[in-house]
């Protein structure tokens, strides 16, 4: 009898040896078999999101079938389904059906273009920290890197400033050059495309301009929203897009918003941008911010304890760029003061940050008291272990507010709530943070309580 659970472990071990950590986590970490039919050999597999489902069906199902046959002589029939409790803050737009466009022979690659690349050597998949806010985008980027021109084309990554869009885009470029050193990869800011086009008209070098942009294997365009209201540029980019797409060359774009939200973007460009996949990156949650700081500290050779990393992460909740900037500021302050980096030094270094301007007189017991009164329960219940909803929600909100309105570390907050582990506090914080975006009652309660505690 075929033991699908043992086989799944065997297959995971095979794939772990093949994939790097980022790719393995993207495709296997939250994927699991849920049932197996001994008669039909149908194996139902649960995946986390539509991107993972598409990648498994296109790229991994054949390997799974081959592995099962080699392992036990079983002709496996994998069926993939998306987890019903999948909870992701990113928006994802399902690709429209691909158009049957004629293809032309592949042009010979030109290595000389690679010399002009301005890819940041640090922007690789290995250096990318995955979290709840970027896992869909990371998965899509990995899929594109594995199958350029065929999986999600174009790939459109959107989100706020400093969230990792450029990192993921350039990681695709690095991956292509690793696997195909002679590939022609062009990475540009949208302003570069605009300037190159204008200069080509002035200098009558349109042929060279089109040779540069229409004969590449991978075109990476950052901040595509700057094409807004530029009709001539949009016309030229439309023809560039058409040529590359018809040649099955990969196009990746980033923007601070969806194509439909870019003002005065032509309808035909909006339409073509939606042929592939549009996926959002949202601000990193607390756990991801801590992981980013830890990796950055290791790269800089800094020794920083977990409580201090936790404190720094709690002070910057906007984007990765500002988060890393806060760490640089702490490092510089430690150098000037000739002192080791600890939580007290971090507090002094970051005192002018907005989030540090918290009510230092506010204590966790006061928060517990106000929350308990608001929800008509007791502080003892908030500190207790009851798991009924009437207690769990107020307890999690109290932990969230303790995190938001005081300087207390995660372990300290956990201690104030009956000795709970810091991971429990982190889970509570992230859960309330997410629910505030979808649950009006939770959002109102948190707003009311903040008003009561801050005034």
UniProtKB/Swiss-Prot annotation:
One of its GO terms (molecular function) is ATP binding. One of its GO terms (cellular component) is plasma membrane. Residues 74-117 are annotated as: Domain II. Residues 1-74 are annotated as: Domain I, interacts with DnaA modulators. It is found in: Cytoplasm. Residues 335-455 are annotated as: Domain IV, binds dsDNA. InterPro entries: AAA+_ATPase, Chromosome_initiator_DnaA, Chromosome_initiator_DnaA-like, Chromosome_initiator_DnaA_CS, DnaA_C, DnaA_dom, DnaA_N_sf, P-loop_NTPase. Its main location: cytoplasm. GO terms for biological process: DNA replication initiation; regulation of DNA replication. Keywords: ATP-binding, Cytoplasm, DNA replication, DNA-binding, Lipid-binding, Nucleotide-binding. It comes from the Bacteria. SUPFAM superfamilies: P-loop containing nucleoside triphosphate hydrolases, TrpR-like. Coiled coil: none annotated. Residues 118-334 are annotated as: Domain III, AAA+ region. ATP binds at residues 162, 164-166. Oligomerizes as a right-handed, spiral filament on DNA at oriC. Domain I is involved in oligomerization and binding regulators, domain II is flexibile and of varying length in different bacteria, domain III forms the AAA+ region, while domain IV binds dsDNA. Plays an essential role in the initiation and regulation of chromosomal replication. ATP-DnaA binds to the origin of replication (oriC) to initiate formation of the DNA replication initiation complex once per cell cycle. Binds the DnaA box (a 9 base pair repeat at the origin) and separates the double-stranded (ds)DNA. Forms a right-handed helical filament on oriC DNA; dsDNA binds to the exterior of the filament while single-stranded (ss)DNA is stabiized in the filament's interior. Belongs to the DnaA family. NCBIfam families: DnaA (TIGR00362). This is Chromosomal replication initiator protein DnaA. It comes from Lactobacillus acidophilus (strain ATCC 700396 / NCK56 / N2 / NCFM). The lineage of its organism: Bacteria, Bacillati, Bacillota, Bacilli, Lactobacillales.
């Amino acid at each position: 009898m075929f033991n699908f659970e043992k086989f799944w472990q065997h297959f995971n071990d095979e794939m772990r040896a093949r994939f790097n950590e980022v790719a393995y986590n993207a495709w296997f970490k939250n994927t699991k078999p849920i049932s197996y039919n001994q008669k039909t050999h149908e194996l139902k597999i649960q995946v986390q999101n539509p991107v993972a489902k598409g990648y498994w069906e296109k790229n991994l199902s054949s390997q799974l079938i081959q592995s099962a046959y080699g392992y036990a002589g079983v002709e496996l029939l994998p069926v993939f389904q998306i987890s019903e409790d999948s909870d992701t803050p990113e928006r994802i737009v399902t690709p429209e059906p691909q158009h049957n466009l004629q293809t032309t022979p592949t042009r010979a690659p030109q290595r000389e273009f690679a010399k002009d690349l301005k890819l940041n050597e640090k922007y690789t998949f290995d250096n990318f920290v995955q979290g709840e806010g970027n896992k869909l985008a990371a998965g899509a980027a990995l899929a594109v890197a594995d199958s350029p021109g065929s999986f999600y084309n174009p790939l459109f990554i959107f989100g706020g400033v400093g969230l990792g869009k450029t990192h993921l885009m350039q990681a695709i470029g690095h991956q292509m050059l690793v696997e195909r050193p002679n590939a022609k990869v062009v990475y540009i800011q949208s302003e570069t495309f605009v300037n190159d086009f204008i200069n080509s008209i002035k200098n009558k070098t349109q042929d060279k301009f089109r040779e540069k942009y229409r004969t590449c294997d991978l075109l990476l365009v950052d901040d595509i929203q700057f094409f807004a209201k530029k009709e001539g540029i949009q016309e030229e980019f439309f023809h560039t897009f058409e040529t590359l797409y018809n040649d099955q060359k990969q196009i990746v774009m980033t923007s601070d918003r969806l194509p439909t939200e870019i003002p005065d973007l032509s309808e035909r460009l909006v339409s073509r941008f939606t042929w592939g996949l549009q996926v959002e990156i949202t601000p990193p949650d607390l756990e991801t911010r801590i992981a980013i700081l830890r990796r950055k500290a290791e790269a800089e050779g800094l020794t920083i304890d977990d409580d201090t990393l936790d404190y720094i992460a709690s002070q910057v909740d906007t984007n990765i760029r500002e988060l890393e900037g806060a760490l640089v500021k702490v490092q510089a302050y430690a150098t000037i003061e000739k002192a080791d980096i600890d939580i007290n030094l971090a507090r002094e270094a970051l005192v002018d940050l907005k989030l540090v301007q918290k009510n230092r007189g506010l204590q966790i017991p006061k928060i517990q008291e106000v929350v308990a009164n608001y929800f008509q329960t007791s502080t003892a219940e908030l500190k207790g272990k009851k798991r009924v909803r009437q207690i769990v929600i107020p307890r999690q909100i109290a932990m969230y507010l303790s995190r938001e309105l005081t300087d207390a570390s995660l372990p300290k907050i956990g201690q104030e709530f009956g000795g709970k582990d810091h991971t429990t506090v982190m889970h509570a914080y992230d859960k309330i943070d997410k629910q505030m975006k979808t649950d009006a009652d939770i959002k109102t309660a948190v707003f009311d309580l903040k008003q009561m505690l801050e005034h």
